[in-house]
Amino acid sequence: NEIKDNDIFVITQKIVSKSEGMERDLNKYEFEDLIKSETKQIIRKRGDLIIAKTKHGFICANAGIDKSNIEKNKALLLPEDPNKSAHKFRSQIETASGKRVAVVISDTFGRAWRKGQVNFAIGSSGISPITNYIGKYDSFNNELFATEIATIDEIASAAELVMEKSIDIPIAIIRGLKYESSNENAEILIRDDQEDFFL
């Protein structure tokens, strides 16, 4: 199928990191040292598991460094700048296709207080990250004061349903979803420390 205007490309972090040379040989690097190199702040530690705030501002296990779906004795770091990566991929797709598209880069994170993992957007380009309902009214005519939907996170999670970890499909296209184009990116989803009730 050919690319269409307003297609949303959801691209896994793994192929972005691999394409940008973020693979590390664990015969040459200690896994703990890699975590330290990517960590801004350690939030919690239990046994071998470290919950860390990365240089990007993400709070996740082992600073987002992954050893799954990759050769043995290898580790994969997050992209240096996932939003820049998303913009690069979007520019390449638009140049090649002549169509206007959006790009979301996804990665799998755990969640506090709930079991299981979901995909989140760690980078984006060409799509508003948040759908803001503040000041609008619900179906009972109640004014909404706090509802902001993390649209690109929902897109990343929806795409995971067809990408599937075990078969490792690296790209999904979401078509037919209405969205607002924007110059903002996934960075605006990161809550400032001063606003974070749990830090």
Positions of the model-derived regions?
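Phosphate-interacting basic helix/loop segments used at nucleotide- and nucleic-acid interfaces
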Residues: 1, 80-99
